Curated annotation (Swiss-Prot):
Family the entry assigns: Belongs to the purine/pyrimidine phosphoribosyltransferase family.
Binding positions (diphosphate): K66, G67, R188
Annotated InterPro entries: HGPRT (IPR050408), Hxn_phspho_trans (IPR005904), PRibTrfase_dom (IPR000836), PRTase-like (IPR029057)
Subcellular localization(s) per the UniProt record: Cytoplasm
GO MF annotation, one: hypoxanthine phosphoribosyltransferase activity
Organism domain of life: Bacteria
UniProt-recorded name of the protein: Hypoxanthine-guanine phosphoribosyltransferase
Enzyme Commission number(s) from the entry: 2.4.2.8
Cofactors, names only: Mg(2+)
Record: residues binding Mg(2+): E122, D123
Active site as annotated: D126
Sorted UniProt keywords: Cytoplasm, Glycosyltransferase, Magnesium, Metal-binding, Nucleotide-binding, Purine salvage, Transferase
Length: 203
């Protein structure tokens, strides 16, 4: 199944919120997210089954903290193969709503990935600058294979010429929060993904 195209948001159906008035609209419901993750899990399992049998090694999921933590947890459960986790923290965001393009490592991997089948798991790819840097960095560590899975992809990412093997949803350029994505460390705990009311980040 192809990438789901999301072109517009809907008004929240349930007004009772953890953050009253902050969410302008719901872009992806919890049900839509989980259904797509189930599809991604099956696709990834099909693609890596032979490699796992050949190497005898589990698929290594490298997760970029913090936004992708909820996604990778659900994704791992949806992949019908054994997986292992590694965490990396890189930063190109401040307290703004756009990527700065300046990348720095906040936390590196705890193990050698040489000879491993590696799947980078991202929450959202917007400019593609951070992901492009990450791919270059990890490729120097000589994994057996290196691919990317992102839950969300924004239009500008297509111009970055970054190969993304698995995409959950193509979304507009809106600044989104929820399901692990934050603004100033808030809203990660929402079960859905929504657009933030501009008044929140224009204060």
């Amino acid at each position: 199944m192809g990438v789901a195209q999301i072109s517009s948001a809907i008004t929240p159906a349930q007004p009772a919120e953890l953050y009253p008035g902050d969410i302008k609209s719901v872009l992806l419901t919890a049900e839509q997210i989980q259904a797509r993750i189930a599809e991604l899990g099956r696709e990834i399992g099909d693609n890596y089954r032979d490699a796992a049998a050949e190497t005898g090694q589990d698929l290594l999921l490298i997760t970029v903290l913090k936004g992708a933590v909820i996604f990778v947890t659900d994704l791992a459960r949806a992949i019908p193969l054994p997986t292992q986790f590694e965490f990396m923290a890189v930063s190109s965001y401040g307290s703004s709503t756009s990527s700065s393009g300046v990348v720095r490592i906040l936390k590196d991997l705890d193990r050698d990935i040489q000879g491993r089948d590696v799947l980078i798991v991202e929450d959202v790819v917007d400019s593609g600058l951070t992901l492009s840097w990450l791919l270059r960095n990890l490729s120097t560590r000589h994994p057996r294979s290196l691919r990317v899975c992102t839950l969300l992809r924004k239009p500008d990412a297509r111009g970055a010429h970054v190969d993304i093997a698995y995409v959950g949803f193509d979304i507009p350029n809106d600044f989104v929060v929820g399901y692990g994505l934050d603004y100033d460390e808030r809203y990660r705990d929402l079960s859905y993904i929504g657009t933030l009311d501009p008044r929140v980040y224009q204060q």
